[in-house]
């Protein structure tokens, strides 16, 4: 099996969906391995814009399988809404497969997410309140309900009653709140499971069959390395592992199956939610990037925080995800800026450091050390090779590659599929 993993190298929203869609044309199977509908992928082609949250980007290719792996947490009601929306626009979803071992998000997870954020007050994480974190907590506590359980009426009924009893005690003690009732959950979610029944299967077997048949598999990451619960800006992170290594756990394939890891980044940096952000901008350059780049969350609609490109972050992501190739998106967004900056290191308590601190208080004290490069004014949205880019834009990309220690295999100069340029064959 030849396989490629696509991961975000920043705090998510790097354009992974577009790159996955671009690479999916040559793949046989496209599989998601982590996260839930807190993720948001925007894909544009043929003059149409599609916003996905749970459905893998490969859904648009009828002859390829789009897999939701066991490491994904699935809100069945939200998933059906997404599938219905695609069907209404003439997109077939018959090629979708959902792991029977994927955990199910239920209304009490959404309630718990809301209550937890309220309890934290000024120390809130800034979650999307989609129930992702509480679902992963239940998984770790071994009380989670999986897709296989949802499909069996007696199993689902028994497990749901047990969990509601537990959640009621927990909600009362922690938040002075009550859990959604059995009657408020059971019928709707069991019916949702029955509608999804034909999609649910042992997806690890599908991927193993692809391996035996020497097919091409594309693994689609969600969020980004800096949101990884182990390697990100903890505790301002997601509740799963977006790093490439989680492909093995989140889909059931062996670690020797991975051939390449494509690290996706923007030509600048953005993040949604709270937490340290060393290169964050609050000036006119930041306003330019946010408005030209349309930096508003796909899932939440919230304005994203934006900042200059941070090579400290990228080097960290390269190391913990084993990144072999770099895909740089949204280069066109920087057009028109007199000067563009790259963070090369941090200053911490008067000392220069080049590695990302694990301690949050230290990270908050870090000041970015910038290298300034001249900007460009030329329209680059039609450029199809590095040689076609203005010299200043080309120098900017080459400097990023040099600082991060990874060569560039893909660059993008606009939101459409046709504006994504491959510099070398990856399969």
From Swiss-Prot:
Residues that bind Mg(2+): 13, 40
Predominant location category: cytoplasm
Alphabetical list of HAMAP family matching this protein: Adenylosucc_synth
Organism: Staphylococcus epidermidis (strain ATCC 35984 / DSM 28319 / BCRC 17069 / CCUG 31568 / BM 3577 / RP62A)
UniProt cofactor note: Binds 1 Mg(2+) ion per subunit.
Binding site for substrate: 298-304
Name by which UniProt lists this protein: Adenylosuccinate synthetase
GO CC annotations, alphabetized: cytoplasm
GO MF term (any one): adenylosuccinate synthase activity
Function: Plays an important role in the de novo pathway of purine nucleotide biosynthesis. Catalyzes the first committed step in the biosynthesis of AMP from IMP.
Active site: 13 (proton acceptor), 41 (proton donor)
Subcellular location: Cytoplasm
InterPro entries, per database record: Adenylosuccin_syn_GTP-bd, Adenylosuccin_syn_Lys_AS, Adenylosuccinate_synth_dom1, Adenylosuccinate_synth_dom2, Adenylosuccinate_synth_dom3, Adenylosuccinate_synthetase, P-loop_NTPase
Family of the protein in this entry: Belongs to the adenylosuccinate synthetase family.
Cofactor(s) demanded: Mg(2+)
């Amino acid at each position: 099996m030849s396989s490629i993993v696509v991961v975000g190298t920043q705090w998510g929203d790097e354009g992974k969906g577009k790159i996955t869609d671009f690479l999916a044309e040559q793949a046989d199977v496209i599989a998601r391995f982590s996260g839930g509908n807190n993720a948001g992928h925007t894909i544009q082609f043929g003059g149409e814009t599609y916003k996905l949250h749970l459905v893998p980007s490969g859904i648009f290719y009828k002859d390829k399988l789009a897999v939701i792996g066991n490491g994904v947490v699935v809100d069945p009601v939200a998933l059906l809404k997404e599938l219905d929306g695609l069907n209404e626009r003439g997109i077939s979803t018959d090629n979708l497969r959902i792991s029977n071992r994927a955990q199910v998000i239920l209304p009490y997870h959404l309630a718990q997410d809301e209550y937890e954020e309220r309890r934290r007050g000024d120390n809130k994480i800034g979650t999307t309140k989609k129930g992702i974190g509480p679902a992963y907590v239940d998984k770790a506590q071994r009380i989670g309900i999986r897709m296989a359980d949802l499909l069996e009426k007696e199993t689902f009924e028994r497990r749901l009653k047990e969990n509601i009893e537990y959640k009621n005690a927990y909600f009362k003690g922690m938040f002075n709140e009550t859990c959604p009732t059995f009657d408020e959950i059971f019928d709707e979610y069991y019916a949702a499971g029955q509608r999804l029944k034909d999609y649910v299967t042992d997806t690890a077997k599908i991927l193993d069959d692809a391996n035996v048949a020497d097919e091409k598999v594309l693994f689609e990451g969600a969020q980004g390395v800096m949101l990884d619960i182990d390697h990100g800006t903890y505790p301002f992170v997601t509740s799963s592992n977006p790093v490439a290594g989680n492909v093995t756990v989140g889909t059931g394939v062996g670690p020797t199956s991975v051939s390449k890891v494509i690290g996706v980044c923007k030509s600048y940096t953005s993040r949604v939610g709270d937490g340290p952000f060393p290169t964050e901008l609050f000036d006119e350059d930041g306003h330019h990037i946010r408005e030209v780049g349309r930096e508003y969350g796909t899932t939440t609609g919230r304005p994203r925080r934006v900042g200059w490109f941070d090579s400290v972050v990228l080097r960290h992501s390269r190391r913990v995800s084993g990144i072999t190739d770099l895909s740089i998106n949204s280069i066109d967004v920087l057009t028109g800026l007199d000067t563009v900056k790259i963070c090369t290191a941090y200053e911490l308590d008067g000392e220069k450091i080049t590695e990302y601190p694990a301690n949050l208080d230290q990270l908050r004290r870090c000041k970015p050390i910038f290298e300034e490069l001249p900007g460009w004014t030329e329209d680059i949205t039609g450029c199809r090779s590095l040689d076609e880019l203005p010299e200043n834009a080309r120098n900017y990309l080459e400097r990023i590659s040099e600082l991060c220690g990874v060569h560039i295999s893909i660059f993008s100069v606009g939101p459409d599929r046709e504006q994504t340029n491959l510099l070398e064959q990856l399969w």
